[in-house]
């Protein structure tokens, strides 16, 4: 019976559900005391995300505290890079650091095809354990970084404010960049298939930095490779709902809808009603409460959730933030978000 499947999975597939499911991007993280305590004992991010016992424990922390409708693998979009021959570290307060940025054809040609079951068996183990632990109480989500965003990190070598290095490559050596993007698209599709086979029921692709592109350049350097990932995954896993998130997506929203994904995750700079009007009816939406609102009062959080859900009524909708929850957010406000999300239909009434 479909009713026994997790609420989030049913909603993501487009079934009629009793309320929008709710989870939060970065719901496992620094705003939770249990996470900070664990981080103090295990200061290396790569250890926390690549040790299966730690990754599993962290993934489950918000589920135990708040019972969200989705439990997402605790990992990072850069986790598959070493399996392709690119080493990285994540430095506290500095973010990702790539030891040897990719700037030449010889470096791109030296990249290995990703074999996740060999280079990242911990991911499969954690996803399987999460499925066993949450059963049908929540959907298990997997995720990846999109080719453009991965390329931005490995070409720049770190986070960037203006993306000058990768844009120089895009406009001076486009063939080189396309070769890198194509390699990432194939490998990321392989990684997503592995996640789904290991237990992920819904997957999300983060193209965090695609919002830094003009619409024309999005069409050239981001969208074709997003679509390649989606097409490859849909060939083997057509029934797994696929979500796409871009930070700062207002300028490319319609274009996102043409990538083949099932659900667009809206950031908070787009009004929910206006965003829906710009997308075809068959595409669902996720979001899109401003994460900054979680520094406000429980009443403000509740009112904004009510407004968001009202505007999305009648469309496939997963309630979420418009970006990851911010460090320093009061943990009780994270709880208030989940509680308000689960009780929203009591306040705004049924369909």
Curated annotation (Swiss-Prot):
Which residues are connected by disulfide bridges in this protein? none
| InterPro entries per record | UROD/MetE-like_sf (IPR038071), Uroporphyrinogen_deCO2ase_HemE (IPR006361), Uroporphyrinogen_deCOase (IPR000257)
Top EC class of this enzyme: lyase
Please state where this protein is localized.
Cytoplasm
Q: Which reaction does it catalyse?
A: uroporphyrinogen III + 4 H(+) = coproporphyrinogen III + 4 CO2
Q: Which residues bind substrate?
A: 26-30, 76, 153, 208, 323
Judging by the UniProt lineage, the source's domain of life is Bacteria
- A GO CC term? cytoplasm
Sorted UniProt keywords: Cytoplasm, Decarboxylase, Lyase, Porphyrin biosynthesis
Q: In which pathway does it act?
A: Porphyrin-containing compound metabolism; protoporphyrin-IX biosynthesis; coproporphyrinogen-III from 5-aminolevulinate: step 4/4
- Please, one GO biological process term? protoporphyrinogen IX biosynthetic process
Q: List, alphabetically, the Pfam families matched.
A: URO-D
User: Listed GO molecular functions?
Assistant: uroporphyrinogen decarboxylase activity
Q: At which residues is there a site annotated Transition state stabilizer?
A: 76
Where is this protein primarily located?
Answer: cytoplasm
* Xref: CDD domains: URO-D
**Would the keyword Lyase turn up in this protein's UniProt record?**
yes
**Its EC number(s):** 4.1.1.37
Q: Which family does it belong to?
A: Belongs to the uroporphyrinogen decarboxylase family.
Q: What does this protein do?
A: Catalyzes the decarboxylation of four acetate groups of uroporphyrinogen-III to yield coproporphyrinogen-III.
NCBIfam families recorded for this chain?
hemE
Show the PANTHER family listed in the entry. METHYLTETRAHYDROFOLATE:HOMOCYSTEINE METHYLTRANSFERASE RELATED, UROPORPHYRINOGEN DECARBOXYLASE
Summary of subunit composition and partner proteins: Homodimer.
Descriptive protein name: Uroporphyrinogen decarboxylase
Source organism: Synechococcus sp. (strain CC9311)
Question: What phylogenetic lineage does the species belong to?
Answer: Bacteria, Bacillati, Cyanobacteriota, Cyanophyceae, Synechococcales
